């Protein structure tokens, strides 16, 4: 469902930019294009790549590699699936709100400081999605902890990714919640000095990309799996050298 939604948003962007002028987006709601870009980026990263590569492959392959019938907390892992599905619904509800500003998938201030329902729904969806990812990361670390040294390259890569997510997700969540605080509680965490405030919107960028680099690790992990499996079978003696060269 997430992949289909992301592809549809991508097609809308491509059709709209095919030539100059309005094509499929109404001139009465031009801000829909900004909302489209926001939701396309967030859905493809947080609801397609990370659940598919990190959640799907991890839940399937980590128990196989460590010789376990299941991950250590399977019921808790079901909660992460529920949180991810709920966050996707919250994200898609942003399409049904009033005409408003799309802050982009990075949710940078000051664009994200306008007190509109679209931005709030996007932020709440990200926070709920982060909670599901945090639960999955804890599950992975505890499942593979005792057999980490004996496992193949895939398991340490997933565990390292999980540890990075455990440390960086609370930072991103705090930065996003401070945006809501600025919008509705008159705080000045991210309100810049241009408006006479003492906030620091650049600090938000540092906090966001502190997590943003970690979110790319599930993509790298899949490369580790493919290179490790192929090179180990065909080039046993020089496999690690080939893997590093490919990466």
Predicted regions and their residues:
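Membrane-embedded and interfacial regions of multi-pass energy-transducing membrane proteins
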Residues: 1-247
């Amino acid at each position: 469902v997430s992949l289909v939604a992301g592809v549809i948003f991508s097609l809308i962007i491509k059709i709209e930019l095919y030539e100059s002028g309005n094509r499929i987006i109404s001139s009465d709601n031009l801000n829909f294009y900004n909302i489209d870009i926001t939701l396309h980026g967030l859905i493809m990263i947080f609801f397609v790549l990370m659940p598919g590569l990190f959640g799907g492959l991890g839940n399937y392959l980590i128990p196989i590699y460590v010789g376990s019938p299941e991950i250590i907390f399977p019921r808790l892992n079901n909660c992460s699936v529920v949180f991810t599905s709920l966050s996707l619904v919250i994200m898609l509800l942003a399409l049904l709100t009033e005409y408003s500003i799309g802050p982009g998938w990075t949710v940078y201030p000051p664009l994200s400081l306008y007190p509109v329902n679209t931005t709030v729904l996007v932020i709440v969806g990200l926070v709920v999605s982060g909670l599901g990812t945090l639960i999955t990361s804890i599950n992975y670390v505890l499942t593979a902890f005792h057999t980490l040294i004996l496992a193949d390259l895939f398991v340490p890569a997933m565990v390292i990714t999980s540890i990075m997510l455990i440390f960086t997700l609370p930072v991103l969540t705090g930065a996003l919640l401070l945006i809501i605080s600025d919008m509705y509680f008159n705080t000045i965490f991210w309100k810049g000095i241009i408006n006479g405030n003492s906030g620091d919107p650049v600090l938000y960028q540092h906090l966001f990309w502190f997590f943003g680099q970690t979110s790319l690790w599930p993509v790298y992990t899949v490369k580790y799996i493919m290179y490790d499996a192929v090179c180990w079978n065909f080039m046993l003696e020089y496999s690690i050298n080939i893997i590093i060269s490919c990466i």
